[in-house]
């Protein structure tokens, strides 16, 4: 199978961001037009992705896509790709056979987020401290969501190259006196505290319950939405502390990723949680934790951080790649199927 990103895809191209709960699609009719957003699909409403695409997209449009470029949350190995947090198993060969497609590429969901930060529009990001972006320097994107997604973006050979990985599973340990009070009450995974155990939707509840337990109080808020809403309104003291600590711990992990990639091109926070708690991220705690990386604090103060506020950032990244794949070093070997 080809692995060169300069090989184009036949238009029209269906691009999709397939998450654990929702699947979002857009149609790109040519290399110059804007992608046409389609109604989001709940993955639980359909038995297979083929059924979802046929009934929700193909049956409702006169445009027949010739290609599909999909970003999925799950390991891409072989001809069957199970989603990490949903029941769908993506079988590209079946998509070619049943949906009239000629070309299918499957990439990691945070590769798509990384593609989106190559050239974000000013209106799609909000800067949270630091200096100016250094053009063509490495970048990092982190996204607390169902889990904690992390990817790098490096520039080499005249191309932006996304670097996916499992950075959300790095260790996250206590540092302050308050951390040491809270940590015994956090739920670990197989005996260790990974970043994803705190820095995601369920992680907010993990942290909230631990804060309440450390205070000797009952955890009265039922879900992540209640915690974040109560924190932003100031209605619940434990929720306020939870979101403040969440911002601190996200700053620590984001700072670690910035050091790993020497991300002078910027560190970007993606996803719905980052957008919702943006007021908390704009407070000093996030940047203070991000910059607290002795002996490199002076360097860290120069690295800009941003919240991505584009509602469909992954789709914008996929669209940029679909238009001009030669501008990106996306590995295709073992991930592209054609007939």
From Swiss-Prot:
It comes from Sinorhizobium medicae (strain WSM419). Keywords: ATP-binding, Cytoplasm, Glycolysis, Kinase, Nucleotide-binding, Transferase. This is Glucokinase. The lineage of its organism: Bacteria, Pseudomonadati, Pseudomonadota, Alphaproteobacteria, Hyphomicrobiales. Its EC number is 2.7.1.2. It comes from the Bacteria. Belongs to the bacterial glucokinase family. It catalyses: D-glucose + ATP = D-glucose 6-phosphate + ADP + H(+). GO terms for molecular function: ATP binding; D-glucose binding; glucokinase activity.
């Amino acid at each position: 199978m080809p692995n060169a990103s300069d090989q184009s895809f036949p238009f029209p191209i269906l691009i999709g961001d397939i998450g654990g709960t929702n699947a979002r699609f857009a149609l790109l009719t040519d290399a110059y037009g804007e992608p046409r957003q389609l109604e989001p699909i709940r993955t639980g409403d359909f038995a297979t992705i083929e059924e979802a695409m046929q009934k929700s997209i193909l049956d409702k449009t006169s445009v027949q896509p010739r290609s599909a470029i999909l970003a999925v949350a799950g390991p891409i190995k072989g001809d069957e790709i199970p989603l990490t947090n949903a029941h769908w198993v993506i079988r590209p060969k079946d998509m070619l056979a049943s949906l009239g497609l000629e070309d299918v590429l499957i990439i990691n969901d945070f590769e798509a987020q990384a593609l989106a930060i190559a050239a974000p529009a000013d209106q799609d990001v909000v800067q949270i401290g630091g200096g100016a972006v250094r053009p063509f320097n490495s970048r990092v994107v982190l996204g607390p969501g169902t889990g904690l997604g992390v990817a790098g973006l490096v520039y080499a050979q005249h191309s932006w190259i996304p670097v996916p990985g499992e950075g959300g599973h790095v260790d996250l340990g206590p540092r302050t006196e308050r951390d040491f009070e809270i940590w015994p009450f956090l739920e670990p995974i197989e005996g260790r505290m990974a970043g994803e155990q705190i820095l995601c939707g369920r992680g907010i509840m993990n942290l909230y319950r631990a804060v309440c337990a450390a205070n000797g109080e009952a955890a009265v808020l039922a879900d992540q939405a209640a915690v974040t809403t109560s924190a932003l309104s100031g209605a619940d003291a434990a929720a306020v502390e939870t979101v403040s600590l969440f911002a601190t711990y996200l700053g620590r992990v984001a700072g670690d990723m910035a050091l790993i990639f020497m991300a002078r091109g910027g560190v970007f926070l993606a996803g719905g949680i980052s957008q919702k708690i943006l007021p908390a991220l704009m407070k000093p705690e996030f940047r203070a934790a991000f910059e607290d990386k002795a002996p490199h604090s002076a360097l860290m103060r120069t690295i800009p951080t941003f919240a991505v506020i584009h509602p469909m950032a992954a789709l914008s990244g996929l669209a940029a790649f679909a238009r001009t794949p030669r501008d990106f070093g996306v590995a295709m070997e073992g991930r592209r199927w054609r007939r």
